[in-house]
Amino acid sequence: VSQADIAAVQTSWRRCYCSWDNEDGLKFYQTLFDSNSKIRHAFESAGATNDTEMEKQANLFGLMMTQFIDNLDDTTALNYKISGLMATHKTRNVVDPALFAIALNELVKFIGNQQPAWKNVTAVILSQMKIALSSN
């Protein structure tokens, strides 16, 4: 991933994240759930069955994305964060890489700007997620 892509993603995420906890996070999750029943089912089976729980999950997702995006310049730290997330998802038996791809693609569409840079960055994140899911 180029430094220009990293800078574009970091800048656009910081703008989006300013209203993530108050508004955009829940909007994103509602859009995500409406777009894919498998994603909805995965979250509902983990307990996100109402707006309060969805908002809680959205806030956690925002924090996780912030950690990923803040570490785009540090491959070791980024891989560590991704591996930790995948380990947690393995304990919940959420191991289908397609679900993570859907979520990341929906995030790219939701953010709306800097899409080529976001696609490059999320491709790297998804690749590392697949590696982490396949490891023991």
From Swiss-Prot:
Family matches, as Pfam families: Globin
CDD domains xref list: Mb-like
One GO MF term attached to the UniProt entry: oxygen carrier activity
Alphabetical UniProt keywords: Heme, Iron, Metal-binding, Oxygen transport, Transport
Domain called Globin: residue spans: 1-134
Record: residues binding heme b: H89
Signal peptide (UniProt feature, chain positions): none
Family to which the UniProt record says this protein belongs: Belongs to the globin family.
Subunit structure: Homodimer.
Protein name per UniProt: Globin-2
Natural source organism: Phreagena soyoae (Deep-sea cold-seep clam)
Organism phylogeny: Eukaryota, Metazoa, Spiralia, Lophotrochozoa, Mollusca
